[in-house]
Amino acid sequence: MNTTPDMPTPRALRELTPLEARILGVLVEKQHTVPDTYPLSLNALTAGCNQKTARSPVMNVSEDEVTTALDSLKHLSLVMEGSSSRVPRFEHNMNRVLGIPSQAIALLTILLLRGPQTAAELRLNSARLHGFADISSVEAFLDELAARAQPLVIRLPRAPGARENRWMHLMCGEVNVADFAGPDTGGGTDSVPPSEFEALKAEQKRLADEVARLNALVQRMATELGIDVDAPGDVS
């Protein structure tokens, strides 16, 4: 689904470091979400790399580390430094170097910033970068990225109980897909996503605490009224 047939011929690239990949993701993201401050200063770029939300994994890098990574990205022509400002500012050049359209850049950016995602998650999380009409259009661009001579993404095996496959970027090199498959539990039912499972555990604890509080209140009131009340779990 290449909607821009005149895209430049893609170049072969070396594997990026996690920080280099994070920098590219931040530059594309901020280009769309805060265009008034783009290209980014070193300070803004570092803050974006260390951002706590919409990042996986969360990083804590210094400006010196970002500067070193920027130098490497400039040698690869993936990043350009502007000269029209007193403060150095940086912008990405991914479209031209990778030879892919903006729709694919949007999907790749989310994978760079957030880690493995399903097509549905990518459509949702990339909305501020590009509005995809449906999940099938997301998958079409992902399939193109995966079918390149130098693949940029890979479809991970569906984890046991999961309804959808996740996708992962390959900008930092090949991955062992078995690491992302998860253990085979042998069950035939759908599993609960980790976030929902944690929420259920928290709700269970809250309800248990509430029951304990109400039991204590009943016992206290019964004592004050001189009423004999069986303790919870007693069988008369």
Swiss-Prot record:
InterPro entries: DUF480 (IPR007432), WH-like_DNA-bd_sf (IPR036388), WH_DNA-bd_sf (IPR036390). Transmembrane segments: none annotated. It holds the Pfam family DUF480. This is UPF0502 protein BamMC406_5439. Belongs to the UPF0502 family. The lineage of its organism: Bacteria, Pseudomonadati, Pseudomonadota, Betaproteobacteria, Burkholderiales. HAMAP family: UPF0502. It comes from the Bacteria.
